[in-house]
Design a protein with these regions (language model features):
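Conserved Rossmann-fold NAD(P)-dependent oxidoreductase catalytic core, especially the SDR/UDP-sugar
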Residues: 25, 82, 87-131, 136, ...
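Short, conserved active-site loop motifs that form the nucleotide-linked donor/cofactor pocket
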Residues: 45-46, 142
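SDR active-site strand-loop-helix element
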Residues: 8, 34, 71-72, 107-113, ...
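NAD(P)H-binding glycine-rich loop region in Rossmannoid oxidoreductase-like domains
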Residues: 5, 46-95, 99-102, 116, ...
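Short, polar loop motifs at secondary-structure junctions
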Residues: 33-40
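Oxidoreductase cofactor-interface core, primarily capturing Rossmann-like NAD(P)-dependent enzymes
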Residues: 29, 117-217
């Protein structure tokens, strides 16, 4: 294969792992990284485009690729306000999906366990709303991944998340049955699943929960 991909959120935890995998995978010939800063990964496959992420609609020609991997995401604490958070997790994703709708057949989005447009929690409500918006586009194949708390070496330190990870690792053995879906998951595992979903010859719109993601990678 000779696939071209756009990666959004490449400097994040999952995005960074994803780019490493794409660089090594012979199915991909070009990786377009759109953002404010480049990644610290050297490869002849990588094309970095410094773009205004708040005005992605001005860069729609960059979306003339086979697949868009959207790993955009922040926290309310990092963004400073709910409005700032929504600008990244909803508006930027919306603009990316609208650009992708014109060109690509596959769009793969990182969401969150518990995403629900009707949730009372602002974070989960926003994630649910962006899922709904993406699913309503005319993109032929959409995969939405809902990972639980992520394990990995994050450049951006999130103190609250650090506590959550420590607790999750302690609690993992007792999370059985229907509670298994709450177990933490390695960022690399999520990235591996994104590549698998892209290379599958499957059309349609799908949502994958954290445990499904884990099992997919284990069985491949």
């Amino acid at each position: 294969m000779n696939r071209k991909a756009v990666v959004l959120g490449g400097t994040g935890l999952i995005g960074g792992e994803l780019i490493k995998l794409l660089v090594k995978n012979n199915s991909y010939s070009e990786i377009r990284i759109l953002g404010r800063r480049n990644v610290d990964i050297a490869s002849s496959k990588i094309r970095f485009y410094k773009v205004d992420m708040e005005n992605l609609q001005q860069h729609e020609s960059l979306f003339e690729v086979d697949v868009v991997f959207c790993c955009l995401g922040t926290t309310i604490k990092t963004a400073g306000t709910k409005e700032g958070f929504r600008k990244v997790d909803y508006e930027m994703v919306m603009n990316a999906a609208k650009n992708a709708e014109k060109y690509v057949k596959k769009f793969i989005l990182i969401s969150s366990l518990g995403a629900n447009a009707n949730a009372s929690n602002f974070y989960l409500k926003t994630k649910g709303e962006v899922e709904k918006m993406v699913l309503e586009t005319k993109i032929e194949s959409i995969s939405i991944l809902r990972p639980s708390i992520l394990y990995g070496n994050r450049v951006e330190k999130r103190s609250g998340e650090k506590v959550g990870i420590a607790f999750m690792k302690f609690a993992t053995p007792i999370l059985q049955g229907s509670l298994k879906k709450y177990r933490g998951i390695e960022a690399r595992t999520v990235a591996e699943a994104m590549v698998i979903y892209d290379l599958e010859e499957k059309k349609g719109k799908f949502i994958y929960e954290s445990l499904e993601i884990e099992n997919l990678v284990k069985n491949n």
